[in-house]
């Protein structure tokens, strides 16, 4: 039985490290997948998916990184380079790749079992 102690100690240490890396209720870094890009394009290009208090209108040039947060669905925080636009027809990926870009955080809430997809915030990064 003494040979099991080191194994159990290793398993306990692994569990502790794994749980401390994920902050409860916090955001976790995530590799951007094609499905994530599809979700961003679908939500960000559709003005009817915008929460009523989201007044910023941008197109995105590229996704720099992504974080997710599990809530009653999932929050996706896309860190993007993008440009301010004047028309809802310009939302989504930037058609003009030569626009003057800035950094933004776009938060999208998704709840797959209710088909909810909502842009909850677009914030310039300072």
UniProtKB/Swiss-Prot annotation:
GO terms for cellular component: extracellular region. Secreted effector that interacts with and inhibits the pathogenesis-related papain-like cysteine proteases C147 and RCR3 of host plants. Inhibition of host proteases by a pathogen extracellular protease inhibitor forms a specific type of defense-counterdefense mechanism between plants and microbial pathogens. A motif (Secondary area of contact) lies at residues 69-73. Residues 1-21 form the signal peptide. Interacts with the host papain-like cysteine protease RCR3. Interacts with the host papain-like cysteine protease C14. GO terms for molecular function: cysteine-type endopeptidase inhibitor activity; peptidase inhibitor activity. It is found in: Secreted. Induction: Expression is up-regulated during infection of host tomato. Belongs to the cystatin family. Gene3D superfamilies: 3.10.450.10. InterPro entries: Cystatin_sf. The record marks 25 as: Reactive site. This is Cystatin-like cysteine protease inhibitor EPIC1. Keywords: Glycoprotein, Protease inhibitor, Secreted, Signal, Thiol protease inhibitor, Virulence. Glycans are attached at residue 46. It comes from the Eukaryota.
